[in-house]
Amino acid sequence: MESGKTTIAKIIKRNEPGGRVPIWLMRQAGRSLPEYRKAVENMNNFMEICYNTDLVTELTLQPVTRFDMDAAIIFSDILIIADVLGCDVNFVRGVGPIIKPVESPKELKGPQEIETKTLPILNAIKKVRSQLPKEKSLIGFAGGPWTVASYIIEGRSSKTFSKVLNFYPSCLKEIIERITEVTIIYLIKQIEFGADVIQLFDSNAGALSEPLFKEYVIEPTKRIILAIKDRFSDFPIIGFPRSAGNLYKDYCEQTGVSAVSIDYNVPIKWAKANLNIPLQGNLDPNLLAYNKTEAIKEAKRIIDCFRDLPFIFNLGHGVLPDTPVENIAALVNLVKSY
């Protein structure tokens, strides 16, 4: 899977810098690319795209081909787990995911069908890995259990999370446990099919108080990581508890993650002083989309801060759909040559 060159996977495993700072971007495959828009122009259902092996393979490789990214991330969605659990997941253009809200853990299916249901995605992982140059890592992923739970209880993305935060605690805990169980199986399968690195996206982590963050983010993440490391002892796992603020420190120290991706609100000097594992991040995607000059300037500041550490350049969240491809190309060229 890996060659003698220093891959992202090796930087994380060895916990040491790998020479040049590597780069990949969250949501690097997607609507910002004209070739993506062309490939999906006849597809109306986003979930159908996610279960189409050949299309997922093509979409995953597009940004690697165009920009020579140092990693590919499998084209998929964190709500695949919700779909596997029997939730009715639909993506509405301009709105995002809409799900029939779950009222009780009894409504969720068990993990029995997970491999059958996700086989098209797993086969895409296998296919991408066979086509990807050896020096480039393939990243598999899943949503953090808290984030997936918040979507299936709220029924859509939320700014307040009022419904999930007022949900019966015992029911919420059981839903998170069920999601955790299925996520473990799914991620182990991704590794078996060829993923070199796993990233856990806990996009809604910032909604929680410190005690709830420990219960709903740290504990399930720890359980997932222990299960993976039980099978694959030094496997590189990146955690992304977005908007966790000072709780990033607890997350790094208590979950067992191999590396952490930081959002663009995290002060880089604070991260360098407090987070003692390989770091990934954290350019503001708004800068990349709307102010190329400022984005390049900020990218240099980030690299200057982290270049003596095991560090992977990324954004602090996903690429925005209207980001000009020339801005992405300029960023990649800067990071690779700086």
UniProtKB/Swiss-Prot annotation:
Catalyses which reaction(s): uroporphyrinogen III + 4 H(+) = coproporphyrinogen III + 4 CO2
Q: Which GO biological process entries does UniProt record here?
A: protoporphyrinogen IX biosynthetic process
Sorted alphabetically, the Gene Ontology cellular component annotations on this record are: cytosol
Q: Binding positions for substrate?
A: 27-31, 77, 151, 203, 317
Q: Which residues form a coiled coil?
A: none
What is the enzyme's main class? lyase
Record Pfam families:
URO-D
Q: Which UniProt keywords apply?
A: Cytoplasm, Decarboxylase, Lyase, Porphyrin biosynthesis
Per the UniProt record, the site (Transition state stabilizer) maps to: 77
- InterPro entries linked: UROD/MetE-like_sf, Uroporphyrinogen_deCO2ase_HemE, Uroporphyrinogen_deCOase
Q: To which pathway does this protein belong?
A: Porphyrin-containing compound metabolism; protoporphyrin-IX biosynthesis; coproporphyrinogen-III from 5-aminolevulinate: step 4/4
Role noted for this protein: Catalyzes the decarboxylation of four acetate groups of uroporphyrinogen-III to yield coproporphyrinogen-III.
The protein's matches in PANTHER family, at most eight in alphabetical order, are given as:
METHYLTETRAHYDROFOLATE:HOMOCYSTEINE METHYLTRANSFERASE RELATED, UROPORPHYRINOGEN DECARBOXYLASE
Q: How does it assemble?
A: Homodimer.
Similarity field: Belongs to the uroporphyrinogen decarboxylase family.
The name this protein goes by in its record: Uroporphyrinogen decarboxylase
